[in-house]
């Protein structure tokens, strides 16, 4: 169960960072 929770948090952080970087790149015009 702990491994599933850890994997879920890892996936959440990766997806959040990826979406945030896309927003930053979009606003900077790259």
Swiss-Prot record:
Keyword annotations from UniProtKB, A to Z: Chloroplast, Electron transport, Membrane, Photosynthesis, Plastid, Thylakoid, Transmembrane, Transmembrane helix, Transport
Chain ranges passing through the membrane: 4-24
Membrane topology recorded in Swiss-Prot or TrEMBL: Single-pass membrane protein
Pfam families hit by this protein: PetN
Cellular component annotations (GO), alphabetically ordered: chloroplast thylakoid membrane; cytochrome b6f complex
Superkingdom field: Eukaryota
GO molecular function: electron transporter, transferring electrons within cytochrome b6/f complex of photosystem II activity
Compartments, as annotated in UniProt: Plastid, Chloroplast thylakoid membrane
Primary residence: plastid
InterPro entries in the record: Cytochr_b6-f_cplx_su8_sf, Cytochrome_b6-f_cplx_su8
GO terms of biological process kind: cytochrome complex assembly; photosynthesis
Assembly, per entry: The 4 large subunits of the cytochrome b6-f complex are cytochrome b6, subunit IV (17 kDa polypeptide, PetD), cytochrome f and the Rieske protein, while the 4 small subunits are PetG, PetL, PetM and PetN. The complex functions as a dimer.
Function: Component of the cytochrome b6-f complex, which mediates electron transfer between photosystem II (PSII) and photosystem I (PSI), cyclic electron flow around PSI, and state transitions.
Family that this chain belongs to: Belongs to the PetN family.
Name the record gives this protein: Cytochrome b6-f complex subunit 8
Gene coding for it: petN
């Amino acid at each position: 169960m702990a491994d599933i929770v850890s994997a879920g948090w890892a996936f959440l952080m990766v997806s959040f960072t990826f979406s945030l970087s896309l927003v930053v790149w979009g606003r900077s015009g790259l």
